[in-house]
Amino acid sequence: MIAVLKTPLSNHIKANTKALFSSLPKTKNELEISLDDLAKQIISGYRLSREEAIILTQIAGEEDILLLCEAADRVRQACCGNVVDLCSIINVKSGGCSENCSFCSQSVHHPGEDSPIYGLKSTEEILDQAKAAEAAGAKRFCLVSQGRGVKYNSPKSTEFEQILGTVRQILAETNIKPCCALGELTPEQAQALAEAGVTRYNHNLEASEHFYPEIVSTHSWNDRVETVKNLKAAGIQACTGGIIGMGETWADRIDLALALRELEVESVPLNLLNSREGTPLGGLLKLDPYDALKAIAIFRLILPKQIIRYAGGREAVMGDLQALGLKAGINAMLIGHYLTTLGQPPEKDQAMLKSLGLQGGETPIATNGL
């Protein structure tokens, strides 16, 4: 069991790490020593402050960023092990969404050409996809629906009841664990999902509270937080993360990670923006893969015990550097296709894991606090 530090950092942390947070070391060797010491402190239970995390964002240059990744990877190994949590998703209802999320091609405010429009898929079709995901190695299968939330749908009860029935059918006919991402939930809906057998629910914060109004105006960041609290109160694990590369600052990224830590979410999907033509963010330059690696590493240092998941955009942004993310703090992957874009074949992902000495499976949640 990891010991939790009871007294301030100044009473524990070594001189090398103190130096890291007073000014960044000038040589590669000094930086490596300082980051190694920081990793040891985090493994022992130290929690990074906002100011310390922002200092880490000043690390620049490919070689130094890779040193940061190595430190994060040591934390990942010590706190999470070498099993990579594999999941898959299905878009059970697509297009025509009332919300104006700037990154999403399913919005009625800016529909993308690559976004199909269809109603809720049948239980049989969803079940077939669940079986295919299980055969590909996924341990969880998430039913994702467009829209602000099922509580806003009309007729309100029919679709939600169908989803509950589909969840029960998946549990009866497969060994894969069904998850859901249906938008905002009332406490009663969260409880109904828990009773049907849903143990994890995806509802991303997407960005920091400060940056959120820049990308969405039809609902608030606090609306999202409320749903996360509702599902956790029902005993459902929170799969809650965000998107990197929407024009946010490094401080915004740190604030998102800290908010996730405060909410004690269990799983953190990190999407790397793969901008879609026709959306307000369609013209943004692609995120630099080394900035993505730096973000992944800092998220791991802030969230040492959480499942941190490669989600949408990893192929488009990381390209041939995808494997480096798995050595920078990532310990989970979404395999197969995404909501409106294609992913790489699961066999390629499995081969990548094997080449890194990692094993696909299901990562247990930390039982001694997040």
Swiss-Prot record:
Its cofactor is [4Fe-4S] cluster; [2Fe-2S] cluster. Transmembrane segments: none annotated. Pathway: Cofactor biosynthesis; biotin biosynthesis; biotin from 7,8-diaminononanoate: step 2/2. It holds the Pfam family Radical_SAM. Residues 79-314 form the Radical SAM core domain. Disulfide bonds: none annotated. [4Fe-4S] cluster binds at C97, C101, C104. Keywords: 2Fe-2S, 4Fe-4S, Biotin biosynthesis, Iron, Iron-sulfur, Metal-binding, S-adenosyl-L-methionine, Transferase. [2Fe-2S] cluster binds at C142, C179, C239, R309. Binds 1 [4Fe-4S] cluster. The cluster is coordinated with 3 cysteines and an exchangeable S-adenosyl-L-methionine. GO terms for biological process: biotin biosynthetic process. It is an enzyme of class 2 (transferase). GO terms for molecular function: 2 iron, 2 sulfur cluster binding; 4 iron, 4 sulfur cluster binding; biotin synthase activity; iron ion binding. It catalyses: (4R,5S)-dethiobiotin + (sulfur carrier)-SH + 2 reduced [2Fe-2S]-[ferredoxin] + 2 S-adenosyl-L-methionine = (sulfur carrier)-H + biotin + 2 5'-deoxyadenosine + 2 L-methionine + 2 oxidized [2Fe-2S]-[ferredoxin]. Homodimer. Catalyzes the conversion of dethiobiotin (DTB) to biotin by the insertion of a sulfur atom into dethiobiotin via a radical-based mechanism. PANTHER family: BIOTIN SYNTHASE, BIOTIN SYNTHASE, MITOCHONDRIAL. HAMAP family: BioB (MF_01694). Belongs to the radical SAM superfamily. Biotin synthase family. This is Biotin synthase.
